[in-house]
Amino acid sequence: MKLSVFYLRRMGRALMHGKYTVCLGGMTVLLVFSLAFSTLEQSFLNTNLDLDGKTILTALLIAVLSLAVTSPAQVGVRSLFGDIANQREAKLAHVFQWYGDGKRLNRSIVLMLLQSLLFLAAAVVFFGLVFGGAYAIHPEWFAGLTSNNIFAVADALTTVYTLALVALVPTYLVVVPFLPAPYLLAEDPEKKPLVCLRESRRAIRGFYWKYVGLQLLSFLQVIAYAFLASIVAVLFSGGDIT
């Protein structure tokens, strides 16, 4: 039976009934960890503008520490989602189980590291092709980045952001088959990370574009909520949206 993306979303909302609190709790844990390390790394880079060897090494260590701390939470949240989808008892404590078991901790870190390396490899290829091709065709597009004219800089930055978006789309589409891997590890912690990646690629066959569609709808929903929240914030602050 073929199920539309919209029907799958309705099924998901039905399964979430009465479990929003535990789900939001798991997402909050992951968000707090992610924001904490992101803020730490950004603050460090802002106070160390000289990119010498020591600065780069420290930034890499912060990134590695971030991966080690957030990876178990990422797989743990998927475990929580799996409990909800399979109508099992869902508890926030299930997220922290991945920190208390050495084997789970290790495998979650290795899996998320492999996913990050796959994304990085795809990004290097596509960003290199897009930006290299753009520079070969029209080098003047990037000349404005070093200009003293603010309008030239703004125009060049717009070009850079547009090219980055163009490169990001194929990068994402290439790594899509490996995105469900954390769910597979969450369902069976005894699986090795490489096995999860291989099985993820096989499992998504025939459902590739449906998976992309689900993620796209979720992304658009987040943007819509953010837009509405910004309008409400402006109105409550006494601003005029017109």
Model regions and ranges:
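Hydrophobic alpha-helical membrane segments
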Residues: M1-T242
